[in-house]
From Swiss-Prot:
Assigned EC number: 2.7.7.6
Family label: Belongs to the RNA polymerase subunit omega family.
UniProtKB keywords: DNA-directed RNA polymerase, Nucleotidyltransferase, Transcription, Transferase
An individual GO BP term: DNA-templated transcription initiation
Pfam families referenced in this protein's UniProt entry, alphabetically: RNA_pol_Rpb6 (PF01192)
Protein's recorded name: DNA-directed RNA polymerase subunit omega
Upper classification of the organism: Bacteria, Pseudomonadati, Pseudomonadota, Alphaproteobacteria, Hyphomicrobiales
Subunit record text: The RNAP catalytic core consists of 2 alpha, 1 beta, 1 beta' and 1 omega subunit. When a sigma factor is associated with the core the holoenzyme is formed, which can initiate transcription.
Catalytic activity: RNA(n) + a ribonucleoside 5'-triphosphate = RNA(n+1) + diphosphate
């Protein structure tokens, strides 16, 4: 009975692995007391869940949403975004009066080279041969 049911379900759910996940989730829902949408006919919960999917008495998309929701550890809450802040240097950006200019010391190329000469080179470590 289950083999025929699986072949019927492949038309509704393209991927066999997705079908297994959805049917298992629905079987767990039935075990926890969810209402059946087809007659049990002395079948076990996995077979009943496959029959429900094959008969389209339950939507695979709804099952997928319920499965994802059951696996989520944290519920995402959409919070309002803070007011947008204009980008620095964007065209048309207004300059506030309380902005202070930061003094940046400029360095010539010669001063940079003199500073680099004063730095000690890194010590070379001898390579070990294996």
């Amino acid at each position: 009975m289950a083999r025929v049911t699986v072949e019927d379900c492949i038309d509704k759910v393209d991927n066999r692995f997705d079908l297994v996940l959805l049917a298992a989730h629905r079987a767990r829902m039935i075990s926890s007391g969810s209402q059946l949408t087809v007659d049990r006919d002395n079948d076990k919960n996995p077979v009943v869940s496959l029959r429900e999917i094959a008969d389209t008495t339950i939507s695979p998309e709804d099952l997928r949403e319920e499965l994802v929701h059951s696996l989520q550890k944290f519920v995402e809450v959409d919070e309002p975004e803070p007011d947008t802040v204009p980008l620095i240097g964007s065209a048309g950006a207004s300059v506030d009066a309380d902005d202070t200019e930061v003094a940046v010391e400029r360095m010539t190329e010669e001063e940079l080279l003199k500073g680099l000469e004063g730095l000690a080179p890194p010590e070379e470590q001898p390579e070990e041969d294996e």
